Amino acid sequence: GSTLSPHIWRFNERIRLHGKEASDEEICDAFEAIDSARGDVTLTYFEFSALAALYCIAKEHMDVAILEIGLGGRLDAFNAIDPDIAVITSIGLDHQAFLGETREAIGAEKAGILRSRQHVVLGQEMPASVMQRCEALSLQPRCWGAEFSSVCDIEQGTWQLTRQGHSMYEIPLTAIAPHNIALAC
């Protein structure tokens, strides 16, 4: 299963089960279960959305779930999950009103998803705040450019993920944006 945010046309785009969007029925069932279980607890839209995704994925007994952290990381609803692998693809100046004014501040927020004894994959040009968090947790991240990279072939419409000079995967360019190549790891 997987999640993404934001959706473009309809909420169902946020939750994928077995490679397909969750159905209206699956999502409504999830919302009903969450609403009845929450009691007097108030949930934000994002918390409700994250719980719905987790409910749907758990109900399908998925072996693997790829959960896209939405806003930031440290305070994101999905950060309640203790993942085996954490991926930070890039740090830009987004959501500055919530995450901070600089790449360092935003990096510190995004690095809030990192846990000890975890595999970590990092995109290009990580701010020192991310690397410091890795060091504080004794993590050894796989870094874009050092451990892996890619080669785009526009004519063939593919990109190849390479590790130590050896091609690992060839993926259609339409499957993933080239600047998010770290997601494939």
Where are these regions (language model features)?
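Conserved beta-strand scaffold positions in the cores of enzyme catalytic domains, especially
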Residues: 1-2, 86, 141-143
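Adenine nucleotide phosphate-binding catalytic loops in nucleotide-utilizing enzymes
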Residues: 21-43, 93-107, 111, 118-185
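Inter-motif core of Ras-like GTPase G domains
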Residues: 79-90
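ATP-dependent carboxylate-amine ligase catalytic core
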Residues: 2-81, 97-99, 105, 128
